[in-house]
Structures are given as structure tokens and as C-alpha cells.
Amino acid sequence: MERTFAIIKPDAVERNISGKVLDRIEGAGFKIVGMKKIHLTKKEAEGFYYVHKERPFFNDLCTFMSRNPVIVLALEKDNAIAAWRELMGATNPANADAGTIRKDLGVSIEENTVHGSDSPESAAFEIPYFFSSLELV
């Protein structure tokens, strides 16, 4: 079994669609091994997204991610990283395949509902950024 990391972003929490996202996650066969609702500080968002610090969207991304609560999740499934990325869909909801979370629930490239690890290395950084080993079941 592989683990991946997911965030239900502030736009989804604000629109009260977190339950719809969680239904899709469980419906796709993922086991939720860690979950909590948190309100990131801008500094915490900057630490999490440090790999993008030189990108022009970095400041706006960190401001967005810290504007309201998020739900962070550790997910488990065979080939979890690829499976979660497929379920999320393309970053821009306009380009995402029908039936994906971002196509069906995303608003824009900025407010695209969910985040997911893009590699085993990312998951290895992202999961412990938010969860201690005692918080994962």
C-alpha cells in the first residue's frame, strides 16, 4: 500500500463541499489514515509550498491557502499517488476530465478544490509536515 497527501482547499471548505470531496475519496477506495481541519498561517503555507518560492504565484498561493481553514488528509491505497492525481484531475478545472473533482467542483485554476502529492518524494515531505506518526492509523 502506498500513501499520499491531500488537502481540501479553503475554497471547498468555504463552499461547504468538503463532504462531497470526502465521499469521492472513499468511493474511489482510498483509506483515510489521517485527517484534520486546520487554519494555516501564511508562514506555515510558505513552508509547505517552499518548492514554489521562486514562482510568480507563490505569494498569492500562500495568501489563499491561509485565508480560511483547510482539511489535510493522509490517504492509503495501491498506487495512491497516481490514483489521487487521476481523481483530482488537471490543475485547471477547465482542462480537467469529466468526472474528476476539479472538473466537477473546481472554480478556477486558483480555486481548484484540492491539492495532492505529485511524487513519492513530495508525499514523504508533505505527510509529516502535518501529521506525526501517532496521528496516522
Swiss-Prot record:
The active site is at 115 (pros-phosphohistidine intermediate). It comes from the Bacteria. GO terms for biological process: CTP biosynthetic process; GTP biosynthetic process; UTP biosynthetic process. CDD domains: NDPk_I. One of its GO terms (molecular function) is nucleoside diphosphate kinase activity. It holds the Pfam family NDK. Its cofactor is Mg(2+). Keywords: ATP-binding, Cytoplasm, Kinase, Magnesium, Metal-binding, Nucleotide metabolism, Nucleotide-binding, Phosphoprotein, Transferase. It catalyses: a 2'-deoxyribonucleoside 5'-diphosphate + ATP = a 2'-deoxyribonucleoside 5'-triphosphate + ADP; a ribonucleoside 5'-diphosphate + ATP = a ribonucleoside 5'-triphosphate + ADP. ATP binds at residues 9, 57, 85, 91, 102, 112. Belongs to the NDK family. Major role in the synthesis of nucleoside triphosphates other than ATP. The ATP gamma phosphate is transferred to the NDP beta phosphate via a ping-pong mechanism, using a phosphorylated active-site intermediate. Homotetramer. This is Nucleoside diphosphate kinase. The gene is ndk.
